[in-house]
Amino acid sequence: MMNDSQVQLFQLYNYSVYSNGTISNFTNCYLINDEHTPIIESDGMIYNGQSCDSPVKSLASHGAVGIVTACFCFFLIPLLLVNIAKYWKGKPPLLKRRMEFIWITLLILALAVGGFAYIDVDRNLVQGAAMKIFSFTFQTALPISIAIIWHVISTYGFALYRQRIVVGKHAAHFSLDHWIFVVEYYAPIVFYVFNLMGFFLAALHPWTKVVRGDGNAATDGRFKASSVLLAIAWVFACAMFIVYSFVYKLDRRGRWVGMVIMMISILPRIVYQFLETWSFTLNASNVSVNAGLVFGLGFCPPLILAYTVCIYGWAVPSIAELEKEAIHEECRQRKRRTTISRDNSTRSTWGIGSEHDMQCLPPSYETMGPCEKEMKEETNEVEIASIESGEVRE
């Protein structure tokens, strides 16, 4: 412990000793106990000082939650890389890439950093930088998660549109002046206004009073307004899913089930945002809060969402693959119809099925698609080869 001369020097520079084993002048704070005893010189310089927010205590429940969260984030990276390799093949322009995976990358970063910072919450005698980092990343994870849902639903809507146009041949029903295109133009602007405002109000809040345990600062109007705005952004994203389902109809492959699971997965986190905003006892920035509550309602929903999106993206074929499959199926059907028509024409030579043949005449070459042109060229080559070999039908 300090001798009397050291105590007088500290008091000369407005330091006060507190019962929790710290000494501070409201600018600098140091631990003072048997293991950590700061030494002050006559000029005010302090040596052997251990900052109050240094992790000196043993690991506890908050640290275990942080470690588990960080591990789940690292396990998610291989799934994310598989999806990036699948959907970014050929390096498409940035605006045409699957933006949900960019947001998932940011979500992994936020949750991992927040998890590591949460480890030191129990180990710090006085909360400081670790709690600030955790609080910032924790509040950042929710708007990022809602942005992921928005882009997944947007991609789903585009997939339904391409399915109706390419596969269903309903291009005439969706002209450029259709109201859905006007909605799709303004909807992202409205969504990001609510989502970004919710982010700026909560994540960019001054954290000094919050980490010191000021319940009024942790539940002030900024956090309440942020909760409402983020909830509106989530509802708006869900509304766009309903609009897409109404206009383009539900996907027969059952992909809409994955959309519903993703939208519901983040709902507990939104509910917890309201709970912690109106009650400091449940607030994640409160060092006394139950760590299991923070993990179950704070960390788990974004992790479940990220895993669901990555597994869904890995299991479901991409839009390009669906269009390629539709084109190949169309080619097979055209070849089958051409073969049937040629067989019927052969039988009509003997007076069989002539009326049916008149209804199955192939289209002119100018109106043929690429598959029909290919079949026509193959037929001509076969007929020329038959003539040259003398195999002409009498």
Swiss-Prot record:
Keywords: Glycoprotein, Membrane, Transmembrane, Transmembrane helix. It is a multi-pass membrane protein. One of its GO terms (cellular component) is membrane. It is found in: Membrane. Glycans are attached at residues 3, 14, 20, 25, 283, 286, 344. The chain crosses the membrane at residues 64-84, 101-121, 133-153, 180-200, 228-248, 256-276, 291-311. It comes from the Eukaryota. Coiled coil: none annotated. InterPro entries: DUF2434 (IPR018830). This is Uncharacterized protein C56F8.12. It comes from Schizosaccharomyces pombe (strain 972 / ATCC 24843) (Fission yeast).
